[in-house]
Amino acid sequence: MTSKKIPKRYGWNTPVTAPGPVGGTMLKNLRAIVKDPLTYLEDVWQEHGDVVQFPVPKPATYLISSPAGAREILVNQHKETSKKTLQYNNLALVTGDGLLTADTQAWRPRRRMLQPAFHQEMISLSQHHVELGLAKLEIHWQEATAAGPTIIDMDQAMMSLALEITCGALFGVDIESEVDEITAATLTALHGVVARARNPLALPLLVPTPANLKMKRAIKKLDNAVTLIIAARAANQLPATAPIRDMLDVLLDPDLETPLSKQQIRDEIVTFIVAGHETVASALTWAWYLLVTNPTEMKKLQERPERANLVLTEALRLYPPAWVITRRTLSEFTVEGFTIPANSLVIVSPWLVHRNQKAWEQPLQFLPERFETGTPQLGYIPFGAGARLCIGRDMAILEGSMILAQLAQHWNIEAIHNSQVPVDASVTLRPVGGMPVRISRKI
């Protein structure tokens, strides 16, 4: 699993320190990445191994696909890496400098400030918002199936449900009337992020190209959603002495040691609107896909709803919403015996780590029972790892498990075709063309 020929240097005096594809052109590789990034990464990994260097000039660029390599980057060397990469810079065009994209200096105090909003008592209280969201969804499904089974787009249904729950649990507001507009704006904005990442000639957002104008209109709609959310809560904000406060209470607290600016508040709200519902919706959509294409597992879940956590955990392994995690190295260090120079771009791929036989038996199989003895410390990174582990992980797992358990108990959910659904490797993993399923109320 090594290259037949390894040059000493690539263009612009970039040293070669690890195996990787050679002999091709940058343009050829770029076309392959744009066409089908997941297949391209899998092919490169299978041919060259767990640490791969791409044939590009500066910055030196590496793909890390092993459990140990991922841990080295995300945990052991987290102080020697930065989020100042193209991936997060493009995402910041939408979210601003929120918790997801902020670099270490800005991130650390913000994480400390927001952590109380994700303590166990707040996570427990979020169950109420999951129940409310599910009740609304089931009323809608009952109306849709009054005349018999009907076909719905499960991807869109999970997007809308996750957004309502996120806004209720984190911000204490009901945005039911705005759900369609906010989800559409989110998808449009994220599509712009991906388009920019795949186009090295993309012009700055301030240049009024049709694509840039479309993306800016979507961002403006997200800004309007922030205004709506704050206005809806302004008259009902809990005092700083309240025993339990949600995230919006914390953000709007004027008595913070360093009160947040309007821009900082906006950035955090948009970050959690986007990340808080997009990732959960993606995980749920693929969980349903795995269930409807594995009827035996669907039956097990219907008979034992407590298996929902296992199903969701396995779905996150096979279809991790964040399929790549990037870092810029601040100093030189080694990964799996290979030198990674300072100022390199490192790409950790949960998609590949979760398919690595060093951590998983039968890695391509949907086997929820593999998690009956717990979640492994090494090789499972759908929420990242280390200091930058997703702050909303526990809330997302609770929310997703409740949704899978209840809907599987109350509804027959079936695939309408047996063909494999292609994956769109966008900011998160999404099904191309949605996820059509047939639903009917269980008698």
Regions from the language model: what does each represent?
Residues T2-Q105, P109, H128-K136, E176-S177, ...:
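N-terminal membrane-proximal hinge/A-helix region immediately C-terminal to the signal-anchor transmembrane segment
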